[in-house]
């Protein structure tokens, strides 16, 4: 199975979550968490930190990631590892391809599939963090 990751990046004050706005399919026009493909021979944390830096410019020195959960999609022959962390300091975002933005956690319906990618999974992930913490 091909491995992928998505990374939940909370702002330093923990009031906002970092998203990219998809410019093409899958999920064109929707907000998605940053992340990408796990390369052969790469472990999950290496891949998560690499993708985070490639897509946002956020380096290891600015955040500590925890491995929160995994999704296995047998019908798509892939797995998605979910990582979460809170920034230690303010950062300048450097988008790789898709525009980046901070979305407030309070009052946002992350289950809204007309706005957010993932068929409601982002809402599930945010709820898991709110209920059980960041790991």
Task: Give the ranges of each region predicted by the language model.
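Short, well-ordered beta-strand micro-motif
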Residues: 9, 82-86, 104
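Nudix hydrolase/Nudix homology domain
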Residues: 26-30, 94-135
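Conserved Nudix-box catalytic region and its N-terminal flanking loop in Nudix hydrolases
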Residues: 16-54
